[in-house]
Every structure is written in C-alpha cells, then in structure tokens.
C-alpha cells in the first residue's frame, strides 16, 4: 500500500522496507519525494495541528504522571536547541541517523505564502545542527527573491471555434479565476508564456455559459507554474 500511494503521488525515487525510517541500505527516498509526501499530508488538519505544536501536556493516567512533550523542530521551539526559531515556521518533522545525518522537512508561512523546505544529510554536533540553519537560508532566499504575481485575469478572452450554430462560429473563453504564481521578483513579461489547450478543436453547439472547454497553461522559463480551466462566456 505504501508503494501504491507513493506512485499515486508521483514519487519515483523511494523504496521502503520499514515504517519507522531507521537505516537500511534498501530503505531510501529523495528530497522531491519527501516533498510530495508532505504536500499531501499537509491537507490533513490534524496532521498540521500536531506538527505545529511546540509542546503538549499529556494528562496523568493510571499508568503515569502528567508529562510534557516537546517538539524536536528547533525552527518552532527553543526547547532542544537555542537560536534557530524562524518567524513563520509551523512544522514539520526532524529525522536523523548516523548514516543519513540530520534531516528536516519544514514549512513556513509569511504574507499568506506557504513554503516547504526539505534538507537531507546535514551535519550537527549537539548545539549546532545545520538542518535548521540551512532550512532558514532556503526560506530567506525564497522570500527575499520571489513574490506573488498575477499571470492571468478573468477578463482575458480566448477563441473557441463552434460548429452547428446559426448565430456564430466562435465562442469566447475566459479563465475560471484570476491566477497568481510565485515567481522571481525580476521575472520579465516575455519569459511568462501562456498556451491554450482546447478539449475539442471545434465544439458543437449549443454551448452553455460556464461550460469548461479548455485549459490555460502558464509557464515561466519553460516550467509550468499554473494551470486554470477555460470557461465559455
């Protein structure tokens, strides 16, 4: 089931032999696959609540006294190591073995923009753990050099040929909603390209308002940064 779900998420570089992540030569993954796992897990509100909790008091039971547990993620807590707390960080999980080094998948949110960072194989020696400092560097670089930018608006119109209509031979299409993309602040307009993919080269009448007839794809430097359905006007 783990392999099946990983494939459904688009993971291609992972191999599992245990559920706990402890070292085994045949147990491995990649930073990209871990990001894909994380992106899916973040859709679960309970998961995010747990991962963003710095400490939690476990009530006393008939087996143990009250206990307080702390996160090992120093981006959100100073309990374990001082000096790594990062403004906006709210997850997710540390991991380390002698073979893998110090690893961290984390997330941070500033000005409404959430980012995920994955660092693997970092060095550490008690009070200094590079997985936290390297993650902070990645966040600082991204937030300092990228910003949200509108790349499509609902008043943009595209043509769709129509057959079997007495009134017109085309219908106008528009993006279902305005589209923003997280792009370099110095991105040039000529490097942002738009392409239209129609479901059919020619659609038969009648066409109803709001009918989905295609997709608008926006790319930056040949990388897809957004896709949006095109609807009939």
Predicted regions located by residue number:
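Diglycine-centered glycine-rich loop/turn motifs
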Residues: 18-19
């Amino acid at each position: 089931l783990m392999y099946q779900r990983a494939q459904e998420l688009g993971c291609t570089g992972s191999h599992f032999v245990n559920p706990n992540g402890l070292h085994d030569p045949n147990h491995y993954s990649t930073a990209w696959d871990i990001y894909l796992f994380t992106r899916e897990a973040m859709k679960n509100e309970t998961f995010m609540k747990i991962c963003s909790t710095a400490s939690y008091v476990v009530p006393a039971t008939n087996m143990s006294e009250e206990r307080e547990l702390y996160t090992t993620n120093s981006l959100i807590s100073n309990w374990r190591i001082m000096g790594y707390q990062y403004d906006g960080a709210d997850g997710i999980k540390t991991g380390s073995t002698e073979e893998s080094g110090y690893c961290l998948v984390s997330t941070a949110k500033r000005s409404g923009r959430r980012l995920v960072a994955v660092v693997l194989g970092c060095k550490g020696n008690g009070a200094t753990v590079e997985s936290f400092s390297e993650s902070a560097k990645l966040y600082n670089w991204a937030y300092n050099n990228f910003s949200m930018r509108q790349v499509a608006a609902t008043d943009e119109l595209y043509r769709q040929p129509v057959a079997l209509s007495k009134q017109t031979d085309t219908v106008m299409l528009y993006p279902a909603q305005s589209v923003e993309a997280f792009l370099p602040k110095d991105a040039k307009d000529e490097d942002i390209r738009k392409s239209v993919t129609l479901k059919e080269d020619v659609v038969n009448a009648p066409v109803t308002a709001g009918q989905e007839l295609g997709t608008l794809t926006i790319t930056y430097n040949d990388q897809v940064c957004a896709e949006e359905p095109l609807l009939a006007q």
